């Protein structure tokens, strides 16, 4: 389906895109006139453009024009050398001739070689009425459609702008959070050094405790030895006491005699 655009958009597209070919399309009206429109084909475009031209009388056969079947009761179309030329839109550039080469010569397709330079336009299957054309044009994009698209683009642009501001604010927040993380990292590093120093102190204290335990163990062994000696001395004292008691008894016996 060709895409319908405005004359202004067509002129802009003609300046920015390379035009490849065009053909004239006619639609039969009830008053015997044809509605002529030029269908342009552009390079690197996935659609064609129909540019409306003013109403023209019935057109006979020509290189780029095909004559359709006559409607019953309609006037006969002239068929002869005196063919009226197609009316041209003043804003529409003439694309029937290609760009001139160096030296002022035209591309092939001039009067010396009429069989070259133009692509043959296929004959339309049938002519359509105004109503049928309007039904088909409903599928084409209109100025209102372009306006809606422009509005959507404006909304998307504003949305992207707002999102860009939000991303900028979030970037500042992330940057501030990064600084906080760096400060926390330094604090954790200092605390780690302190914990490491405390660990060294605890390790030294543990070594001291081990040495004290060893000394306590040695003192315990000495205490045990002293207890054994005290026990032995106690037994010796008991023997001495018993000996003294026996000696006292003997003395008493001797005195009584």
Swiss-Prot record:
Residues 80-104, 115-132 have a biased composition (Basic and acidic residues). InterPro entries: DUF16. Belongs to the UPF0134 family. Coiled coil: none annotated. Residues 49-132 are annotated as: Disordered. It comes from the Bacteria. This is UPF0134 protein MPN_013. It comes from Mycoplasma pneumoniae (strain ATCC 29342 / M129 / Subtype 1) (Mycoplasmoides pneumoniae).
